[in-house]
Regions:
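Short, charged, low-complexity loops and linkers
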Residues: 120-127, 148, 219-224
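Short, charged, amphipathic alpha-helical segments
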Residues: 156-162, 185-189
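Membrane-interface aromatic/basic loop that binds lipid-linked glycans or pyrophosphate carriers
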Residues: 13-14, 177-241
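Donor-binding/catalytic cores of nucleotide-activated saccharide
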Residues: 1-91, 95-109, 118-128
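Amphipathic alpha-helical repeat scaffolds of TPR domains
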Residues: 161-174
Length: 241
């Protein structure tokens, strides 16, 4: 993998390269996941339009750009010169890619699936996260700083609303996850309280998320309509609580 990415980078005169990957389940089933962009060589403008802007403002669409950092070969010079680092253990990959690709000048992409990614049902992202809301708040603080630093708001005017919707949908699924030992009524109240927060309420009233799956569309409609009891009952049935 690294040799192919490196050769792709060198032959294109690029500072970064990326590839597709294979998703793999524990039972051996696998499928190809497309690269972030079609095979080719991209300049800074195309990198911003194809990676940075979607990471900034399009977080609920049908083809969200994910923070798959293991699909790229990065420039050590950029990382060290610009001090691009990680913070925290959740959603940090999105911020890392946002910041890094604001500095990258040339990206070579191959559609070869060079990495095998195990879909682990026991990973942290598949379990109840007790501190998710606090983690997401910190994520938004850092994302806001990046958006301001790199003047991203002009290209992504509703990035806050879009990002808050994405976080809200994750928070709802997390609140009703089997690992949460709170009573159902307390979980429902937690979601209602979250939706009343000014930044979340603004996103709910100011943006109708597009490109959601059928299930998430239903969740979004129930939230926008204030039907939290129905939402809770649907999750109770779904998760057999």
């Amino acid at each position: 993998m690294l040799e192919t990415l490196y050769q792709s980078l060198v032959s294109a005169g690029a500072d970064s390269s990326g590839c597709a990957h294979l998703g793999v389940t524990p039972d051996g089933h696998s499928w190809a996941e497309a690269a972030v962009l079609p095979a080719g060589v991209y300049d800074r403008t195309a990198i911003l339009e194809g990676i940075v802007y979607p990471l900034t403002g399009d977080r609920t669409g049908a083809r969200v750009v994910n923070g798959f950092i293991w699909r790229y070969l990065f420039s050590a010079d950029i990382l060290q010169r610009e001090n691009v680092t990680f913070e925290g253990a959740y959603l940090e990959d999105e911020l890392f890619l946002m910041e890094y690709f604001c500095h990258a000048q040339r990206l070579a992409v191959t559609e070869q699936p060079l990495y095998r990614y195990l879909i682990n049902p026991n990973s942290a992202t598949h379990k109840y996260m007790r501190d998710f809301v606090q983690t997401f708040q910190r994520f938004m603080e850092r994302k806001s700083a990046l958006a301001e630093r790199f003047s991203l708001e002009a290209a992504c005017p509703q990035w806050r609303e879009n990002s808050h919707w994405a976080g809200l949908l994750i928070a709802i699924g997390n609140e009703y996850a089997p690992g949460n030992d709170k009573p159902l009524r307390a979980r429902q109240q937690a979601i209602e309280d979250l939706c009343r927060r000014p930044e979340i309420a603004e996103a709910i009233s100011g943006l109708v998320p597009e490109g959601l799956s059928a299930n998430k569309q239903l969740v979004a409609r129930l939230v926008r309509g204030g039907h939290f009891f129905i939402l809770t009952q649907l999750y109770r049935l779904k998760n057999r609580m």
